[in-house]
UniProtKB/Swiss-Prot annotation:
It holds the Pfam family Ribosomal_L1. Binds directly to 23S rRNA. The L1 stalk is quite mobile in the ribosome, and is involved in E site tRNA release. Protein L1 is also a translational repressor protein, it controls the translation of the L11 operon by binding to its mRNA. GO terms for molecular function: rRNA binding; structural constituent of ribosome; tRNA binding. Belongs to the universal ribosomal protein uL1 family. CDD domains: Ribosomal_L1. Keywords: Repressor, Ribonucleoprotein, Ribosomal protein, RNA-binding, rRNA-binding, Translation regulation, tRNA-binding. InterPro entries: Ribosom_uL1_bac-type, Ribosomal_uL1, Ribosomal_uL1-like, Ribosomal_uL1/biogenesis, Ribosomal_uL1_3-a/b-sand, Ribosomal_uL1_CS. It comes from Streptomyces avermitilis (strain ATCC 31267 / DSM 46492 / JCM 5070 / NBRC 14893 / NCIMB 12804 / NRRL 8165 / MA-4680). This is Large ribosomal subunit protein uL1. GO terms for biological process: regulation of translation; translation. Gene3D superfamilies: 3.30.190.20, 3.40.50.790. The lineage of its organism: Bacteria, Bacillati, Actinomycetota, Actinomycetes, Kitasatosporales. One of its GO terms (cellular component) is large ribosomal subunit. Part of the 50S ribosomal subunit.
Amino acid sequence: MSKRSKALRAADAKIDREKLYAPLEAVRLAKETSTSKFDGTVEVAFRLGVDPRKADQMVRGTVNLPHGTGKTARVLVFATGDRAEAARAAGADIVGSDELIDEVSKGRLDFDAVVATPDLMGKVGRLGRVLGPRGLMPNPKTGTVTPDVVKAVNEIKGGKIEFRVDKHSNLHFIIGKTSFDDTQLVENYGAALDEILRLKPSAAKGRYIKKAAISTTIGPGIPIDSNRTRNLLTEEDPAAV
């Protein structure tokens, strides 16, 4: 057995699989059981009680994490003229129009987020097969199809994340780094949880959040009590809070 496997087994042994941890306790345990030797990411995953095959049960949105993700996103902006210049001034990493669209269609993917002005969406729409499966396709609902490219770039650079339920009814995204303090991670988790609850489809029946877990880049998943939606910065029993 490799040293890495032994470390992961030892980390997993610290987790009570019969328990649902309070968010603060889960964050602490996730950091404690991380076996990476670098500043790994902290991720959260939710299993939702929705059927993503039905349009009225799709869960998709954005949230501005109060403490960011710990990673500065590389932002690509499809724009021309003054808006292209404004995007560059705002800190966009890649800016262009027709030529850039052609590069992306041929496989260029050195970016983490995409913004487009409305006038270019007729052309950008052809990139659906490339950007769609990667969750990068610009969309008015998430603020990434907009004439205000400066606002969009600033929000993404400032820690705005986008999430979308996958075909297995899962949501997963980064909420920070293992170097973040516990409070920062819990507050980021809380901001994301609030938005996910706000977006609950009216057509969804039964329990909305079925499961939730926090994990690090190299570490086990820590099951979270997803019913815990307030007083997140305590480890007390919710019934006693």
